[in-house]
């Protein structure tokens, strides 16, 4: 009876987010009722095509009813023609006892790869802990006759986490086979690094003598077997973003997924090492096996170090990276073990890196700080409110966007964190309660509001160089080179457009960042007659699928005055911000503005840099920018999905930049950033968070793991 009542409540929930949260009550009711009636009610709900959201909730509730009928229902769902039901059944089976009849369907999902393959792999590995031979023999059979190199690699990677002699025998065979594809041999070698046997050690030693590409993989795996932790390391903070190639020079910012988060982690890591009580920061990101090998040998005992997590194969966009969970977990574990001392791990988003890192942190008993943001909650709420997403198609969209999994991941990360960090935003407490179901007023000591920060000095130097160059004064060689590179781009403009100011937007070429939307708004309005548009970001030579989608849209509306600069280093962007304000003699007029057309912006590093450079800005009306953009004074807040509104706001920003209040606006923006949003202020606030996170653990910590302890 309770199951029926709560099912009705899930179906009647006024919003999609409220229905998702009500799913927990459905599981409790189903477990309480138990028996065939509850199973039949849930099965009917799972198969109801009119309410795909309730169907997903029913699948996960079924998994908690330990009844033979529930197993049979989940088996049926595992073979359903609808992808979202198969995915959630595969996920749900992980909470049940091993079911031999489900192994075949799960292997087929693993073969197909993608997000569903990751879920299937997870369930198979959960079962392998109690029935290793069942899973190992199934994988061994699947390898026979399989020719697809990526599929073979997935099977071998999965086998690598199955305990027992059967799995190790297969790994040794694959690693030794010179006729085997590289991807599978690499997966076998990587897994052998976690096997204690002498045979595994001998195999890795042999493979380690080989050149690239297999040699570095084997040598890194060998290092796994004999980790020599860094001695004498002081209090250490680890942070990560595994979708970017992050180095101290930020040479790849703006390409692929190397966005504002990469800039933030580099600047923040440098600033944190200046804080009392923090000796070392380790920033983990994507890298090659050769880079990982070098980094393991050279992890610093102090200062800001960079450590790559290696993956086999080319980089993939963040939404497609879920199948790299196993590799991410192994790479993160390797680095944190080699680091010797890690006092706290800071996670910032609900992605595969955080999923993997959280598992490693639990294993190594490292306290976690998690930055909580309403993502994907805000997107779900927006689509729900606009009618673009409903119960009728939630599952189909979920199969692409993984909404349910990401919502649950945020919930789990926030619940497990020793401390959570929040971005400032209007009505923060209400947003956290309504969207995430988190009451930050109940235990305020567990939450801290910490705004992001920027390297103001870098922006100031860039602005000063651009001002001097515009006045005909000499500037430093590197600044001159950057400004000359901008001139070369501007020289492509027709002569009649070289007297116009610039509208600048910096960011990844991704639909969330709205670069194509901005180009369309500019090209289809009088804004095009007012200014040229300069878009900075993306890999123009080897674009990712997301970048290609944006470039195709941009090129559809391309016209004289639109310039694509590709990704540029952070220092270059700082000088170009100054050039937008002060102009480039013979190429661009002074009095430009900055436009952020992001669909959502939790805070906005690039916006803060533009304000610090004295530019008026256009920014999304929702999220973080609303807390620092002063409407009509330092910029304009707008619905960035509305082309007309975006163009009008950009025109107003140009009016402000050229009007009598231009200097007042610039000073106001700069002062605001200096007072509230420096990277040093952010580091100071976070250092206090880290102290609290390591001091207030429920489990005992060794005294030398408490941040700041001697």
What does each model-found stretch correspond to?
Residues 56, 87, 118-124:
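Sequence termini and other peripheral, non-core segments
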Residues 2-46, 50-54, 63-74, 80-83, ...:
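Catalytic cores of nucleotide-sugar-dependent glycosyltransferases that transfer UDP/GDP/TDP-activated
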